[in-house]
Amino acid sequence: MGTASSGIAIARSLPLRGDGVRRGIPVVAALRGLGYALLVPFIFFICFTFLRPSPYDFFAIPAMALWFCLGIRLHRGAVVFVALLLLYHLGLLLALLPYFEEPRPVEWSYQSAYLMVTAIFFAMFFADDTRRRLELVFKAYVASSLFAACAGIASYFELFGEGLLFRMDGRAAGVFEDPNVLGSFLIPAALYLVHNLVGGRSRVPVLAVAALAVIAAGIFLSFSRGSWAATVIATVTMVWLMHRTSASARLRRRIVALAFVIAAATAIALVAALGDGDIAERFEDRAQVTKEYDQGVTGRFGNQIRGIPMLIERPNGLGPLRWRLTFGLEPHNSYIGGFANGGWLGGFSFLALVLATGFVGFRLCLTPSPFQRQAQIAWPGLFIFLLQALQIDVDHWRHVFLLFGMVWGLEAARLDWLGRLRRSPTLPARNPDNNPAAAGASLARRGADPAAAAAVGA
């Protein structure tokens, strides 16, 4: 009786979480409902990049403003993330100063700052009520990806004629202006569906398989070499993380078996698609490791080699969007772009952000916590984009900033969870997130590493 009473007293003394939670107040409950109602189209319209302004902006600004008013807060686990983002954008601002009279660099810098705000918002938003919010956002992202994939497929086969949807050089683009962005955008949704199928969490597996087939077709018809490779690497990384952290031999066998089934089905679908002459010809052309525009002194890689000595000599870089004026092309490398657009401060801040996020991401995926499953979807998706950043400019991709916010929101939630466990070890075990022993047992049941689960419950 004494333990239960002390547990209840401790529970009452715990600080309110930042989703905040005056659930008994009808007005606040209604505003929270409105906040979630705005969040879904906010995420869904991420794929609408061909309109200026986009429906994304019409929902993003009121959704973020409302949630800020509802009391989401910056947790200590995301402070490093915010600091590095601010340093990166300070570098952009300093590099912009000589070109403040030019509209395009100024507009680009404003867009960068806007995306930074969305990333910080997501890191704050996902730090509380984490699993429920992430599940909602993943579902909205899958819906967005299905729409984008269907639009891409329609654009490839010109189902609605020319002009309505984007098609570039015979490649599907749909609602995106660039097929490479379409292909990459679809990857996190594919990871979510594969993770649920392999992990046995899909409520209606037939629908999940159908959705995955549509998304895979969208990725394939984008004929983006980077997206093809990224899909394979991200999926293998995620499946390896699932297998590595599973303590159940039965679950490990299931993971391996279903991974082979998905791989075999993909191979069969690829062979069938290549039976079409036009698709086979396009595939053969795009399957080359390098294209003509990549090669030579004035090609993509040649420009990068020529540009690096210039960036070493210029602490303020070239200035936002100045690389294209010097070399006639974008850098097609976000790491070089960080130094070109933001100077040494921007470039090194971006590198530090990537390294810090990599450390946090793999720790989230490999360390048992209530948020491990979501991390094993979000981090491989972001990880592959950070690898793609070596061969394409990802610094204005909305979904990259969403995933940055996810990873750091998960880290903030994990640290907050650990802190609550240490402060309140006698809490009742009804919620495993608030009790070390129950949490360890729960993690073990979910397939976490036994030693790590025991350490959590120690």
Range-by-range predicted roles:
Residues 22-34, 68-83, 196-210, 246-255, ...:
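Membrane-interface helix-loop-helix junctions at transmembrane boundaries of multi-pass membrane enzymes
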Residues 3, 43, 135-167, 174-245, ...:
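Alpha-helical transmembrane segments of multi-pass inner-membrane proteins
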Residues 2-76, 88-102, 385, 402:
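N-terminal signal-anchor transmembrane segment
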Residues 162, 166, 288-345, 361-367:
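Long extracytoplasmic/lumenal interhelical loops at the membrane interface
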Residues 34-42, 362-391, 406-411:
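Loop-to-helix entry and N-terminal half of a specific, functionally important transmembrane alpha helix
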Residues 61-67, 377-386, 393-440:
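Transmembrane alpha-helices of multi-pass inner-membrane enzymes
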Residues 221, 242-291, 305-312, 416, ...:
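A membrane-periplasm/extracellular boundary helix in multi-pass inner-membrane enzymes
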Residues 81-93, 102-126, 136-145, 149:
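Aromatic-anchored transmembrane helix interface
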